[in-house]
Each structure stands twice: as structure tokens, then as C-alpha cells.
Amino acid sequence: NFAPSSSRWPTFWPYDPNPPAHPLQQPYDPITDPAPLNSTANPGLTHTFVLRSWLDAKIPFVPLLAIPYLSFLALTPIILVLNLWMSSFRRFLTAGLALIVSQLVLDVGYLLFQTEVLRDTAAQEVVAQGGFGGTLVKMVWGNDAPFNGYPSGHVTWTTIGILGLWRLRKVIPKTAWILMAWMALVYPATVMLRQHYLMDVYAGLFVGFSCYWACMFLVERPRLVPKVDPHPWPGT
């Protein structure tokens, strides 16, 4: 992830320059807009949209959720292998193609609509203190800058992974349910680690579901109506 230059977006959104009635200007520019929380970007270097809602301000910071957030990188290819090994090549192809198509959709979104997550002071202080949780969050923050957040790639790929596991729940029930429950922790982790806002999560769910089902109909061609019996019972 990277920040666009300050000239990427024109500052055409109106706002009241007189505090305290000054709402956050969109796109956000650290030079002219005082952030509601401390920004992670250097002043003047970014020019991004901030999708922070009133509900985002009430979400707690939970460093330990970095564990499922980081494990997502290992679980995604495992789910693909399970679909190929325990199910069929078509289901494997559906999941794999959905991941590729969804990433292309995300890339277009990131190109046209650049966002930034403003990490609050309390979260930054926890990370600065170190410890087990702080170290985990440093791993997340150090490898994933708070840009390119709408829609959330983690949420999109997690949704595709859970849909793939859902279709394996009768083949390997214990494994499928355990992995689905664990991967579901990625959803709250994205906002509780200050990586995304809730709008990113909602959009990621939509992209994940849409891409998976579109690829499923393209690859597997499921029947939408029951097959007609060519030799029905007499009198029926």
C-alpha cells in the first residue's frame, strides 16, 4: 500500500474553515484539515478519503486480533488445497478464480478511490509500549500501510475462503467449522487493529460474495431448477 501525492485529488468538497465547526474535508489533506485523531501520514504527503463513521470511534483497539489477521495469509492457500483435495477441481477453480477476479476489482477501486485510516493516539501508544500485543501489531502495521482500504482485501478474501469452507462442511465438518470460525475473526480484526473502517468491511463482504457466486456460475454452471424426470411415475 502507498499514499498518493497531494495533487492526486482536487480539494473541491466544501467545508467551514472556522473551528470548532470545521468538519473533516474530503478528500483529507493533513495540511488544511485537522484530523479527528492523529494521522499516520506525514503532513502534506497524502490526499485521501477518510471513511470514518461515528461507530468507528466506538470500536476498541484489540492487539491480540493480530494473530488471526496474520494467519489469514497462510489459511487462504490451505483452503484452496482443501477444495481440490476433498471436493472437486471445479470448486477449486471457482475459489481460485474468485480470488483473482476479486483482486482485480479491488485494484480498480484502489486506483480510483484512495482512502486512508487515521490510527488514533491510544492505539499508537499501545504499540509503542511493546509487549506481545504491541509486537504483533507492529508486524501488521509495518507490512500493511493504512491506504488502499476500500474495499478491504482481507475481508474480501476471507469471505471467499469461508464460502469455500461452507461447501466442505459435510465432507470435513470438524475442519471446515473450525477454520470458518477462526477466519471469521478476521472481520473484527480489520477494524480493531485500525487497519480499516466499517465501510471497508461492508464493501469487502459485497465484493467477496459477488465474485465467488459469479465465478461459481461461470465455472460450475449449477442448475437453478430441479431436473425434470423424463420417466415420471404413472398418474403423476
Locations of the language-model features?
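Membrane-interface loops
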Residues: 3, 7-19, 37-46, 85-175, ...
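C-terminal membrane module of polytopic membrane proteins
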Residues: 183, 193, 203-236
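Aromatic-anchored segments of alpha-helical transmembrane domains
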Residues: 1, 103-109, 181-192
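Interfacial helix-loop-helix junctions of multi-pass membrane proteins
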Residues: 117-124, 145-150, 185-211
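Membrane-interfacial alpha-helical segments at the cytosolic side of multi-pass membrane proteins
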Residues: 74-81, 155-179, 206-217
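N-terminal transmembrane-helix/juxtamembrane module of multi-pass inner/ER membrane proteins
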Residues: 1-76
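Alpha-helical transmembrane spans of integral membrane proteins, capturing the lipid-embedded, hydrophobic core
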Residues: 66, 70, 74, 99, ...
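Active-site His/Glu-centered metal-binding helix of metallohydrolases
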Residues: 71, 156, 198, 202
